[in-house]
Amino acid sequence: MERSKGKVSVFLARLAWAVWILYAAAWSWALLTPQPVRLRDALLDETPALVSSKVVHVAGYLAFTMLSGCLRPAVPYRWLILAFLSLHAFGTEYLQQFVPQRTPSLHDVGLDHVGIVLGLAITWKWWLGTSASAA
């Protein structure tokens, strides 16, 4: 029984990492291509478009942080993941200056970090608890 339990937990850990990597790739793509902006502008007027894009920044990083909490790595690596999320926010905003119809904004980086903080607040037990490998 213990042996099969270990196999299940290894499978779930690998699945969590696979989902995290897919989300990271999809979120990066969404932030670094003009298609989401074109779709937003085709569907919404100026004010709702602006509000929706800001909500998406917060929600995207909130989800990214929650997914990161699901990984439950050893404690020192948790802080590396949070550093990665922060650098991802800065990096994608910086790179947006090279993408047509995208504009970099420190305000958006701030909103990204609001999403990170909200994600931490929601999943704080995952971030402060024992790692999955130690449990």
Regions found by a protein language model. Name each.
Residues 2-107, 113-135:
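Bulky hydrophobic segments
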